[in-house]
């Protein structure tokens, strides 16, 4: 009797909650391993870049003794394992070292650049997610018709076009030919909201184009599956109005995978904007990494790249957690 009761409790809400905790814990552990491997790759990549750190700072004509002294001061002459251990320990504590170019803490530059990239990414996110969901749902409700085919073709075409190609086309059309929008995304610190949006419009559009196809396809697939589900047929047989069936039964289940995809893409929007930010002279994390690589500013480069890795990994972790927490069936199935 006691065995039966304990088994039923384990299979009840408490057991389900424990499975969710184990699932999330496993994902967190895998994310930490991923970040550790990324830190090793980033550190090794910085060490493999050509050029001497001291000479890159002091110049090619610097006295060799001054170069050696600077390398010793920066710790560049220590064993690689010692350098890595000290570097990753400081990074975890929020200390990314001093920039070789500006001789100021890297963390302040990375924090400011990340905030700018987040602004650009969130702006693109709040534009593309409603458009992608609306397009995908509308296509699913007209499956097989010309509207469905048109949305699918537009979404696929926008997805496969590289960001730098769409950025250049937008610059030529709206910045050079029509002169409707400024090419430079940089705006004065005291600029109003309209001026800010005007300067950010061109950098946002390539991101909207790229991610519209992903989100629209996921929304369409989820909606088609939900429309064919038994609970939807039951709701229709009960005589519920079409708009009630769509909003109460179809969308609630169809948008679960779309939400997780959108959360994952948000991480990329914030951290993967090197090309867009460079083309539009936007002071984000992508352009910071590009400029650091050109200047051989290793602390800035390593801090920026690892920060992007953290953002993307956390976004994936949040997406996985949302998918499990919002889907009761997957909550049990994925945890077992």
Where are these predicted regions, by residue range?
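Conserved protein kinase catalytic domain
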Residues: 45-46, 54, 58, 71, ...
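An internal, D/E-rich "acidic patch" concept
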Residues: 2-20, 77-133
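Hydrophobic aliphatic residues
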Residues: 45-49, 57, 61-62, 91-92, ...
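Alpha-helical transmembrane segments and their lipid-water interface positions
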Residues: 54, 93, 166-167, 224
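Hydrophobic alpha-helical transmembrane segments of membrane transport/permease proteins
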Residues: 34-85, 178-199
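Alpha-helical transmembrane segments of integral membrane proteins
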Residues: 18-22, 32, 38, 108, ...
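Charged, compositionally biased N-terminal leader segments and the immediate start
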Residues: 8-45
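Membrane-water interface segments at the C-terminal ends of transmembrane alpha-helices
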Residues: 41-48, 78, 89, 153-184, ...
């Amino acid at each position: 009797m006691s065995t039966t009761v304990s088994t039923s409790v384990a299979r009840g809400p408490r057991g389900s909650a424990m499975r969710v905790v184990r699932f999330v814990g496993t994902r967190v552990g895998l994310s930490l391993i991923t970040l550790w491997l990324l830190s090793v790759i980033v550190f090794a990549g910085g060490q493999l870049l050509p050029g001497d750190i001291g000479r890159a700072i002091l110049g090619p004509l610097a006295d060799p003794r001054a170069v050696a002294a600077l390398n010793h001061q920066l710790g560049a002459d220590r064993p690689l394992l010692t350098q890595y251990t000290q570097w990753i320990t400081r990074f975890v504590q929020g200390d990314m070292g001093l920039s070789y170019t500006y001789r100021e803490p890297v963390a302040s530059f990375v924090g400011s650049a990340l905030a700018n990239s987040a602004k650009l990414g969130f702006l693109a996110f709040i534009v593309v997610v409603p458009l992608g969901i609306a397009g995908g749902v509308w296509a699913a409700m007209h499956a097989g018709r010309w509207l469905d085919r048109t949305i699918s073709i537009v979404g696929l075409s926008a997805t496969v076009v590289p960001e730098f190609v769409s950025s250049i086309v937008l610059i030529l059309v709206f910045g050079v030919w029509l002169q409707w929008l400024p090419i430079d995304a940089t705006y004065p610190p005291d600029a109003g909201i309209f001026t800010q949006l005007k300067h950010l419009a061109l950098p946002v559009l390539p991101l909207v184009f790229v991610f519209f196809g992903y989100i629209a396809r996921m929304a369409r697939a989820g909606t088609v599956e939900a429309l064919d589900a038994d609970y939807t047929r039951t709701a229709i047989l009960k005589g519920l109005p079409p708009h009630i069936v769509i909003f109460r039964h179809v969308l609630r289940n169809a948008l679960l995978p779309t939400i997780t995809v959108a959360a994952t893409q948000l991480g990329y929007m914030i951290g993967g904007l090197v090309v867009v930010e460079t083309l539009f002279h936007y002071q984000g994390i992508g352009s910071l990494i590009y400029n650091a690589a050109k200047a051989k500013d290793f602390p800035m480069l390593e801090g920026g790249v690892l920060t992007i890795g953290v953002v993307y990994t956390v976004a994936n972790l949040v997406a996985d957690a949302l998918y499990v927490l919002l889907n009761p069936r997957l909550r049990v199935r994925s945890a077992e």
